């Protein structure tokens, strides 16, 4: 008969809640294990079946570690600030606060229905003032150390949205969401100096157990490159110099022109009157493009000549100065030297605008395409005949000796744009006074509360909707000096950059978390989440953690020791699940129809955890069938334990049971859940064939299954006569000696042809094997009337008999 999943799952979820089964233990004599999920943004759509995949993976690890005797910290919370709630509020007139609260309650209900073993006493919410007090406190420490500053920054401004959007959110000059026009304009922004940590953010990746692809993405994002800064004097104005950064200063004899970013500070000064209109029109056109569009390698190169020239400081040659959108002011110095013969982008630019192509490294046909390989230098004066490394050293020395350049390290990474012109975010705790002074809100006055507001429409001035709240914005100090609060709010990344610390000590009113507790739990042993967070969230969290380490607030240099990315669950048509495609599967429906245990088992059995796999109703049915097989193996039609479950062991299952304990334990540790489940299926198949089921092995099976299917195993555990939860039952161990068969199979050959298979003791000697083979009835018949010339026995393998032909 089928087990009653709805009844059983509700019963045990109630039990866990009432008994606080998963409350974090902090026993000094136990080791600690911190299993962390990337906390979700609580959207209006609720959970989809992609969420439980990662959550179940960490839950399996947390449940196994509890049973192995660890203190386990396994928490959940909400990354609840953010644009979608604000957009919803603007569209409907509802409060983002109420909308978020409703969504959080729905997410919590759904997560609890999946049987995930979270310690709900440690729940955090980034919109809770008791939480964002510490987000604001971290900002204040960054400000005090000079790592938070204000700057006029060119940003992607969307007048319709009333906010800045990130480069990644601009496509063809319009916002990704809504298709609103975007313009580039300088705005006062708060910026965090993440570049101060660039080297450490790269170098410390080597010590982390993370997927290599993720580490490489972070290295590329930071983009450390070693090169030279070279000063090109402007022709006719020797006092004005343009600094260029190049990773290949050895190609300086092949420079055909200098290209500046349209935003470069010298563009106006360098543009001659006859080129003014053309340059201004070009700059206006570029203002509608994001940095990503500008640097797209596939697009046509564009540019305009300024009318001015520089002098090559090494060769003395006069070179034209152009501006082009593929050069970004935010990278390097905003000026590049164009070497058409040896750079594909420069080659395209030179061909389009008829610039000379001078080969300075031997190889290829540079008139047709750029040669980017290695070779000896030619047409390069004192560098001729040198290879790349020699030439770079030689030119760097020459530049320094002649005072026109120096060796330099450059980074692709830009400082972190930290302000948003929105309402639904953490207020930045800063006051701007009428006399020009800027001060922090005193620490003892934190949190600076986000005020309640009914009108959260964008201000239209480039400020956030908070600018409309006069009573909140305007302040007066004790001396009558007037000031205005900062009206920008923090980005959604802020609260998620440190939440893993708060779980360790979530109710501490005096500090982020007690240092001794942080020492006990950090770094996080296992962090599971989507690969789409490979760069920004993980980079920002590492930056804040390193800063807090420097302050002495946290005891480790890195927050997450091991990172695992779960794959994506696709629609049954192999496409990404989305509302617009109508292929989203709601976990509530699956839990209702099949049960949470089936959903958990199916998602872990679909394939490797990091693979992207299509959803299959058939696979779901198969998982449900297996759970019923386990139930019916042990429970009879009257809902009682079967008589086959006995304290007597006839040893039929010894080998397969011990193999199963070994393989499942090792596979869980390696997070190879699909192969662990396969092994459990093999054991269940063997158990069905056995005459009796030893109680010890039945209990072991139930324990091994419990991290994956916790509800049914709790029920089976109680049917086996245990009081209380299986959650802290001792994890099974295996007997190494039982993994080795006492009996092995050998073959008996006559003149090279196999004539018999014999079961023999694994320790049988040569003489014993020969005797067993020659006395076997079938072999005797084969040898009748034949002369045996030789008998060769190989222990554990074969007996070979040679007879006269």
Curated annotation (Swiss-Prot):
Which keywords does this chain's UniProt record carry? Aminoacyl-tRNA synthetase, ATP-binding, Cytoplasm, Ligase, Nucleotide-binding, Protein biosynthesis
Q: What's a Pfam family in this record? A: tRNA-synt_1_2
Indicate which residues the UniProt annotation says bind ATP.
Answer: 579
Motif 'HIGH' region in this chain: 40-51
Q: Does the keyword Aminoacyl-tRNA synthetase apply?
A: yes
According to the lineage, what is the superkingdom?
Answer: Bacteria
Cellular compartments annotated: Cytoplasm
Q: Which GO terms describe its biological process?
A: leucyl-tRNA aminoacylation
Q: Which GO terms describe its cellular component?
A: cytosol
* Catalyses which reaction(s): tRNA(Leu) + L-leucine + ATP = L-leucyl-tRNA(Leu) + AMP + diphosphate
Give GO MF terms, alphabetically: aminoacyl-tRNA deacylase activity; ATP binding; leucine-tRNA ligase activity
Q: What is its main location?
A: cytoplasm
* Family under the similarity heading: Belongs to the class-I aminoacyl-tRNA synthetase family.
Q: NCBIfam families in the record, alphabetically?
A: leuS_bact
| Protein name (database record) | Leucine--tRNA ligase
Organism taxonomic ancestry: Bacteria, Bacillati, Bacillota, Bacilli, Lactobacillales
